[in-house]
Amino acid sequence: MELKAEEEEVGGVQPVSIQAFASSSTLHGLAHIFSYERLSLKRALWALCFLGSLAVLLCVCTERVQYYFHYHHVTKLDEVAASQLTFPAVTLCNLNEFRFSQVSKNDLYHAGELLALLNNRYEIPDTQMADEKQLEILQDKANFRSFKPKPFNMREFYDRAGHDIRDMLLSCHFRGEVCSAEDFKVVFTRYGKCYTFNSGRDGRPRLKTMKGGTGNGLEIMLDIQQDEYLPVWGETDETSFEAGIKVQIHSQDEPPFIDQLGFGVAPGFQTFVACQEQRLIYLPPPWGTCKAVTMDSDLDFFDSYSITACRIDCETRYLVENCNCRMVHMPGDAPYCTPEQYKECADPALDFLVEKDQEYCVCEMPCNLTRYGKELSMVKIPSKASAKYLAKKFNKSEQYIGENILVLDIFFEVLNYETIEQKKAYEIAGLLGDIGGQMGLFIGASILTVLELFDYAYEVIKHKLCRRGKCQKEAKRSSADKGVALSLDDVKRHNPCESLRGHPAGMTYAANILPHHPARGTFEDFTC
């Protein structure tokens, strides 16, 4: 009997019945379905209700899982007050790239056709449209008889012939304090030689402002020098029909992209630009499409990633690949394009890339971005009351003041910034919470209930497998070993002397019954 019991123990204890498990389970309704009663209408109704609830639960959970894998996001908009804000970088360019007075005979010889001042035969194309004074100067410079051309460099030409901020800047104030041309850093763009205020480069700290409103930002008065504009006798990519400046307000962490993102400021007006800093936070895939910026910007010519840096980087690579040169405003160490390369290759290629090619330069949105919202308003200057005063102050005519002077006032509207943040509409915690809530509502289950079911299923499966297969053989082998051990123990525990001593007559044998034992003796004496 002991061997049989131990064999059953090795084979595995039989799990409790389904009725016993159901009666103690925390899963609602299970005890009513698997009860000890005979099959009845009550049990059938309970089973039907349980299966219906389970089906609804599966449908709801499936819908929640599908919704999660759509990776929806929502946008949170907030305004945060600040005690101070970093003033943005302000880049400005004169819409005229080259000053007429700075174009030399050598410049005209090499770049006259590019500037539409000369035709391909080095002749002035239409003398009837020229101003007499400009025509006389141009005819003298265009006389190339016995002229020996010198080496020409486009970068040097842009730098020398571009408008000088020291000549354009008539007045400058930041937060009521006087500033000067030294506070502007030269930067080259597609508009040529431009200037950036508060660039934050060359070891200069970024300027901050403590208040909002006019008078607490940058206010400058500029002379656009229309008398230095190149005469327009034809159309090229370098030709400008406008008069004024182009302005871009941007973060110090991104280069200016003024030909695409700038706004115009006209002479004869004071332009007010009320700004608000906007901090944008986008989500990376799969919730969004932004690019997570790392220490390595993945750009060839810029240390930090931004959309404008990516565009300039891409345009530079495109021109180097197609024209074997780069424009003056482009970074890198490739040679600068010659005027002929500008006209024949660089300008057409860049125009095609900007306007038509939507696949070559695909720049992803960075996940963190700072931009500046703007509201512009203008008033006419000079007034009739101030025209004579300004003409006398700057030693110009009233007509010149009206045609060339502009005032630009850039300030924060209020001292706060706006955050526009993308957030996950549905996270894993929400998914688990919804599934858990639906489980509790429809079948009264929790995670521990599911563990109960798995534990019971494991015990049943283990018992079935052990009865059919390997466990049974191992049980028999183990039982045999234990049986031998038990027999030896029984022998050791057995004491025959006690039973023999208790025999009333004892046991005696004849002397000859045992060899070499001459005397009679009892069996007790022999064995004990």
Swiss-Prot record:
Pfam families: ASC
Disulfide pairings: 93-194, 172-179, 290-367, 310-363, 314-361, 323-345, 325-337
Compartments where located: Cell membrane; Postsynaptic cell membrane; Cell projection, Dendrite
Alphabetical list of InterPro entries matching this protein: ENaC, ENaC_chordates, ENaC_CS
Residue intervals on the Cytoplasmic side: 1-49, 459-528
Site (Involved in proton-dependent gating): 357
Modified sites of kind Phosphoserine: 479, 499
The protein's assembly and partners: Forms functional homotrimeric channels. Forms heterotrimers with other ASIC proteins, resulting in channels with distinct properties. Interacts with PICK1; regulates ASIC1 clustering in membranes. Interacts with STOM; alters heterotrimeric channels activity.
The family this protein is said to belong to: Belongs to the amiloride-sensitive sodium channel (TC 1.A.6) family. ASIC1 subfamily.
The protein's role, per its UniProt record: Forms voltage-independent, pH-gated trimeric sodium channels that act as postsynaptic excitatory receptors in the nervous system, playing a crucial role in regulating synaptic plasticity, learning, and memory. Upon extracellular pH drop this channel elicits transient, fast activating, and completely desensitizing inward currents. Displays high selectivity for sodium ions but can also permit the permeation of other cations. Regulates more or less directly intracellular calcium concentration and CaMKII phosphorylation, and thereby the density of dendritic spines.
Protein's name in the database: Acid-sensing ion channel 1
Organism the protein comes from: Homo sapiens
Lineage: Eukaryota, Metazoa, Chordata, Craniata, Vertebrata
Gene coding for it: ASIC1
